[in-house]
Amino acid sequence: MRKIIIGSRRSQLALTQTEWVISKLKEAGAPFDFEIKKIITKGDQILDVTLSKVGGKGLFVKEIEQAMANKEIDIAVHSMKDVPSVLQEGFALGATTTRVDPRDALISNEGYTLAELPAGSIVGTSSLRRSAQILAKRPDLEVKWIRGNIETRLRKLKEEDFDAIILAAAGLERMGWSNEIVTEYLDPDLCVPAVGQGALGIECRADDDEVLEMLKTINDDTTAKTVLAERTFLHRMEGGCQVPIAGYATLTDEGEIELTALVGTPDGEQIFKEILRGKDPVQLGETMAQALMDQGAKEVLEQVKKGLESQ
């Protein structure tokens, strides 16, 4: 019997997600043994600066893809929001799992919601997307960068000078912590989620037919379709650098995809937001990108990138 080696980052969340995928594959009747290989990524090692300054989200994927290319591992489980919008040649996205809660979650020391936080309160996030949207709603707040895994960020909220932090609800849910600690879930209308947020992406070698066949059993068609619209938009807009960009798609009762997309400046002073519907996910993502570019969003992203590079 073939043994499938699954590469995972070493954080508790990454391992929990990987174990969940193994359980789903076994439930679906996968005729293989499974083993987890822990991999340290560059993104896990550099914790003192924002992701955008050190190469963006691909930092969490590069070492794992290298291990796959070397055949040290067969598949990798990623949080979909960390997967670059275009995969390297030779790799394939074998499955997109059913999306769980896509929202951002606010956790505050005093139990204040976003609307209730006193002026001057310090909100911790590692995301320019969240920063742009939070400051657009509450320009009287201060955003400070916070890095590290969930446990580290929760500790920093208690020990350092943060009044609140914002994390992805999905990670908290997977760890079984959301009910205890979340002050407020931010509705997607208020804070548009990251592309792919709440879904897992399972990557494998493009020529591994046996694994590709196995992964089909846990692919969720609705999530795959909506995430494809989001990822197409992301690719057309900027292709992977970590910038203030958001995209969230749902399937309507009529079977259409509704895509909400947003581009902004990190200080929240300029926000471009659009909601469009369509049948074809790729076409919808491309149409959305063009709509925001026509409003001037591309120039804003270029300015943001230049600003980040000069810091």
From Swiss-Prot:
Keywords tagged on the record: Porphyrin biosynthesis, Transferase
Cofactor binding mode and count: Binds 1 dipyrromethane group covalently.
GO cellular component terms listed in the entry, alphabetical order: cytoplasm
UniProt entry tagged with the keyword Heme: no
Swiss-Prot/TrEMBL GO biological process terms: protoporphyrinogen IX biosynthetic process
Gene3D superfamilies, alphabetized: Periplasmic binding protein-like II, Porphobilinogen deaminase, C-terminal domain
Reported cofactor(s): dipyrromethane
Residue(s) carrying S-(dipyrrolylmethanemethyl)cysteine: C241
Pathway: Porphyrin-containing compound metabolism; protoporphyrin-IX biosynthesis; coproporphyrinogen-III from 5-aminolevulinate: step 2/4
Single GO term (MF): hydroxymethylbilane synthase activity
Note: The porphobilinogen subunits are added to the dipyrromethane group.
Protein known as: Porphobilinogen deaminase
